UniProtKB/Swiss-Prot annotation:
Residue span of region Disordered: 33-54, 98-137
GO terms under cellular component: extracellular region
Compositionally biased intervals (Basic and acidic residues): 121-137
Principal cellular location given in the protein's record: secreted
Sites carrying sugar chains: N40
Segment forming the signal sequence: 1-34
Keyword Signal on entry: yes
Subcellular location: Secreted
Name of protein: Putative uncharacterized protein UNQ9165/PRO28630
Compositionally skewed regions (Polar residues) per UniProt: 33-45
């Protein structure tokens, strides 16, 4: 236990060792982690990022450790990319379906039916109003 806490000591900044220690004790995986842990962390103590990377590689028992250290950038990118892609794809699909039949209309019957439904129910301006907000956010 002393070796485990000493090995987790340098990783104080990226991930709280007390929380990880409690997590390991609660899961009972402290024994399986105690052997690879001290070697990895004492070798890579100055580069705590790399140490946590090697930590979450071999055993999937400590996913939180690598999440806490080198996940933020990837998580930020992963959180942004689907968001922008969805809004861009959804916004453009919305735009091409709602506006282009009304404005140019590649095929005549779609333009006529779209205009008729637009004049009849006045439901089309609502998606049009939603579209800029969708694309912007």
């Amino acid at each position: 236990m002393a070796a485990l806490s000493r090995a987790l000591g340098p990783l104080r900044t990226p991930a709280p060792p007390l929380w990880i220690g409690l997590f390991l004790v609660a899961t009972g995986s402290q024994q399986s982690l105690a052997q690879p842990l001290p070697g990895n962390t004492t070798e890579a103590t100055p580069r705590s990022l790399r140490a946590s990377g090697s930590l979450c590689g071999p055993h999937a028992k400590a996913p939180y450790l690598c999440e806490a250290t080198h996940e933020p950038a990837a998580a930020r990118i992963r959180a942004q990319v689907p968001d922008t892609r969805w809004s861009r794809v959804g916004g453009q699909r919305f735009y091409s379906r709602v506006l282009s039949p009304l404005h140019r209309g590649p095929s005549g019957h779609t333009e006529a039916s779209a205009q008729r439904s637009h004049m009849g129910k006045l439901k089309e301006p609502q998606p049009q109003d939603h579209k800029p907000g969708l694309g912007a956010s």
